[in-house]
Swiss-Prot record:
The gene is IL12A. It comes from the Eukaryota. This is Interleukin-12 subunit alpha. It is found in: Secreted. Disulfide bonds join C37-C110, C64-C196, C85-C123. Glycans are attached at N24, N93, N107.
Length: 219
């Protein structure tokens, strides 16, 4: 039996450092041999970092730094990106590897070949599900912020656009998550705090996604 909890702990501590080695090996400018989704993941990380930096500047009188916010992961218990994207070299329990070499057909443009392992397909699908959840949250939050009479801050289309581009490249069929809506007047202060929390979490996930793509590009 796979020790799920131990695996998750090891993955959380080791995955980013391990994948950062591959990042150092990858080429910055996309070429014909480059893993197709690496360019999208680089754009995603850049947009996430820029949007967070902009929010911290605009909301300078709000608790919006990493030290001030209550960190929250909206994907917790809903996706398994860290586990699914763990490199084979870090897995010691053979029973966890039974399905990793199974061929699987994907429809997305992230892979040069549509034929891949089951675990790689699971990794990419988990990334897709992460992006979908953040996309819905950002759109819902943006709808609230646009109702703010002060018009202090709202998300531009760049970050929403790069999320959509990577999702299209991954091209997994998935159930549509309905956008949350409310007729009640939102608490704009709390909404802006929530935006800071969401942007910090999203940037961390964008780092993970970019390093996964860098690893796959170097593999």
């Amino acid at each position: 039996m796979c020790p799920a909890r131990s695996l998750l702990l090891v993955a959380t501590l080791v995955l980013l450092d391990y994948l950062s080695l591959a990042r150092n090996l990858s080429v910055a400018t996309p070429g014909p041999e480059m893993f197709p989704c690496l360019h999208h993941s680089q754009n995603l990380l850049k947009a996430a970092s820029n949007t967070l930096q902009k929010a911290r500047q605009i909301l300078e009188f709000y608790p919006c730094t990493s030290e001030e916010i209550d960190h929250e992961d909206i994907t917790k218990d809903k996706t398994s990106t860290v586990e699914a994207c763990l490199p084979l070299e870090l897995i010691k329990n053979e029973s966890c590897l039974n399905s990793r070499e199974t061929s699987f057909i994907t429809n997305g443009s992230c892979l040069a070949s549509r034929k891949t392992s089951f675990m790689m397909a699971l990794c990419l699908r988990s990334i897709y599900e992460d992006l979908k959840m953040y996309q819905v949250e950002f759109k819902t939050m943006n709808a609230k912020l646009l109702r703010d009479p002060k018009r202090q801050i709202f998300l531009d289309q760049n970050i929403l656009g790069v999320i959509d581009e990577l999702m299209q490249a991954l091209n997994f069929n998935s159930e549509t998550v309905p956008q949350k809506s409310s007729l009640e007047e939102p608490d704009f202060y709390k909404t802006k705090i929530k935006l800071c929390i969401l942007l910090h979490a999203f940037r961390i996930r964008a780092v993970t996604i970019d390093r996964v793509m860098s690893y796959l590009n170097a593999s």
